[in-house]
A protein has these predicted regions:
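Ferredoxin-like iron-sulfur electron-transfer modules
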Residues: 1-17, 30, 46-68, 311, ...
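Iron-sulfur cluster-binding electron-transfer modules in prokaryotic oxidoreductases
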Residues: 4, 82-165, 170-425
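A generic short-segment signal for beta-strand/edge and adjacent turn/coil regions
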Residues: 11-16, 34-35, 44, 219-220, ...
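Residues immediately within or flanking Cys/His clusters that coordinate Zn2+
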Residues: 12-18, 22, 63-73, 215, ...
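Iron-sulfur cluster-binding cysteine motifs and their immediate structural context
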Residues: 16, 20-42, 60, 65-92, ...
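A ubiquitous short alpha-helical element
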Residues: 26-31, 54, 108-110, 378
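Short coil/turn segments at secondary-structure boundaries
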Residues: 50-54, 60-67, 73-80, 84, ...
Length: 425
């Protein structure tokens, strides 16, 4: 009856209800609710599989009350792919009930008061408008918020993106290779300074940078919310855009986009379609420490006098198993005081922007607060992270407590170190 859930039966039976997930699951630690912990969610999905439970509103709320951070997956003693079970349950909900029926379960679209979540909803609304055709089901769900001005205050260059679509990011003489830059919606619309840093760093290191004009968002948000068809549409569009660009490598500075392109595209399109594309995709930190650049510690770098700490994005650390590359970049920069944060790998509750933009915003902030004491204990002036969604989440959490910190991507700090050392000012 529910074929998408049925596909997860082998994973479901691996769960022995041991309760180890209660130690690790951020939503459980923030709520102490059994339905919030992975064990409880698997029990509910199993009940649907056995015909003991329908796809009710309550079931849907429980399935969407998960950050999809993979913390439990990487700590499960029986290696249950918990995140896949939950994502498949969401996909079944979308297929069986439709997006319009789930709209008010996923999103709080009330307009009675000023809410921080309106920024997130307006961003996602813009993402839908920019990337999806008019007949896509998501278009019929709009508006998700009428607080456009909330977004305009967050959006630094909405009408003037950091890259001219259709142009090249930058020419260099005798380039090492031609690199395609996948920008991603969050960097394109919220943090264009990260995008400019990517282009500047790659040019300084003798790479030609191409920004394909027809690239769209990675599709991470849509696949995570259970819409496989839209995720597949976006995956095909991006694969085609970069194939036409004929690049040697594809880099992105948004770790959620890297995760989606490396793993999500295989899920929605299959290995045969994505094999060539996947072989070219790199998170920018991975690319810069992969040997294609050469040893960063041998590259002329000027001192950067900052005291920094590092928050590890779940998509990069748990999803892609790439904990080291960002820290290798920081370690290579002279003058930088890098203070390791206790619990750097702890989830911030953003869910790559997806969890924090829905009805779970308040819960996401409660999860983020676990990081507060650890951040403050470092006495760092700058928090470095490889995910723009983590940056927004943690900066909002700190601001709610009256604390302001500078946030930078590893590539921005590398840009500072290269500036001047390469004769670029």
């Amino acid at each position: 009856m529910y074929e998408l859930i049925n596909q997860m039966e082998d994973e479901i039976v691996k769960c022995v209800r041991c309760g180890v997930c209660r130690i690790h699951c951020p939503t459980f630690l923030a709520t102490n609710a059994e339905s919030a912990v992975s064990r409880g969610k698997i029990y509910l999905v199993d009940a649907v599989l056995k015909g003991e439970l329908e796809l009710t509103d309550e079931f849907a709320r429980d399935m969407y009350r998960c950050v999809n951070c993979r913390t439990v997956t990487v700590n499960c003693p029986t290696s249950v792919q918990v995140h896949n079970i939950i994502l498949q349950a969401r996909a079944q909900l979308v297929k069986s009930r439709g997006l319009s029926d789930l709209r008010d379960i996923i999103f709080d679209t009330s307009t009675n008061s000023e809410r921080p979540v309106d920024k997130r909803l307006a961003f996602f609304q813009e993402e839908i408008s920019r990337n999806l055709p008019s007949d896509n089901p998501w278009q019929s769900l709009l508006p998700l918020t009428d607080k456009k001005r909330e977004f305009s205050s967050l959006l630094k260059e909405l009408e003037n993106p950091p890259f001219i679509k259709g142009g090249k990011g930058g020419f260099v003489d005798n380039p090492k290779m031609k690199v395609g830059y996948f920008v991603g919606s969050a960097i394109d619309m919220m943090y264009p300074e990260i995008g400019r840093a990517v282009v500047n760093v790659l040019k300084a290191l003798d790479f030609e940078v191409i920004v394909p004009p027809d690239q769209k968002c990675s599709g991470y948000s849509f696949r995570t919310l259970g819409d496989i068809d839209t995720a597949a549409y976006l995956a095909r569009a991006n694969i085609e855009a970069f194939a036409e660009a004929d690049v040697d490598a594809i880099v992105t500075a948004d770790s959620s986009c890297a995760l989606e392109m490396k793993q999500g595209y295989v899920e929605v399109l299959g290995e045969k379609v994505t094999e060539e594309f996947n072989g070219k995709v790199y998170d920018i930190s991975e690319f810069l420490t992969s040997g294609k650049v050469g040893a960063l510690n041998l590259t002329p770098l000027r001192q950067v006098s900052k005291k920094v700490t590092y928050h590890e994005a779940c998509a990069l650390g748990k999803g892609l198993k790439m904990s080291d590359p960002p820290k290798e970049i920081l370690d290579a920069i002279p003058g930088l005081e890098f203070v390791e944060m206790d619990g750097a790998e702890l989830c911030c509750g953003s869910g790559c922007g997806v969890f924090a933009m829905g009805r779970n915003y308040d819960l996401s902030m409660k999860i983020a607060e676990r990081k507060f004491d650890n951040i403050m204990a470092t006495e760092a002036d700058v928090v470095v992270t490889s995910c723009p969604h983590c940056q927004l989440q943690l900066s909002e959490m700190l601001a709610s407590k009256g604390v302001e910190k500078e946030f930078l991507h590893p590539v921005q700090i590398l840009e500072m170190a290269l500036r001047g050392a390469t004769g670029d000012g």
